[in-house]
From Swiss-Prot:
It comes from Shewanella sp. (strain ANA-3). Keywords: ATP-binding, Kinase, Nucleotide biosynthesis, Nucleotide-binding, Transferase. This is Thymidylate kinase. Gene3D superfamilies: P-loop containing nucleotide triphosphate hydrolases (3.40.50.300). The gene is tmk. One of its GO terms (molecular function) is ATP binding.
Amino acid sequence: MTQASAKFIVVEGLEGAGKSSAIALIRDFIEKHTGLAPVCTREPGGTPLAERIRDLVKIADPSDPLCDESECLLIYAARAQLVANVIKPALAEGKWVLGDRHNLSSLAYQGGGRGLMPLVEAVSNATLKGFKPDLTLYLDLDPKLGLLRAAKRGELDRIEQQAIDFFERARATYLKLASEDERIVVIDASQTMAEVHKDILAVLQAMAW
């Protein structure tokens, strides 16, 4: 495998869309086809500093509520660390990278959900400078169903506790952005897990390996 062949693949989706099982499937597929396990990341998070930022974003503090703009900027601070210190170095070494969320999450959640698209686009351009995944698989699911699934996992975090209209706006933004970028593939996550995995594998098998 050459450096040029290394790819950055991201799995996106609303809460409860099945990202974890999809990531496990893709990780195994990449390892089978390249002989090496991919570098797996999550956002926010993925470096010591970014993980501390993740806690600030995910855990509610009633004594000092996080405002929408701070949430956006913190997430981009974490992302900048991850891209600079993990993702780009791994790709430069010829390693595949598999991400649990990336910039599309901010465009959907903070841009669409929070109504901060001008800020999101400005900070994205300033921090990422056009850096994008080679492929993003967006697991599309009705937010009501997704939140029901998420609730079964246990206590919801600060983001998961947002009102349903927040997630509806985020979903609409995901779908709009997917319609404008051929590198974003929409997967129907309302199907059975076997059907979802079949669709994901079809996308992966169509890639050049």
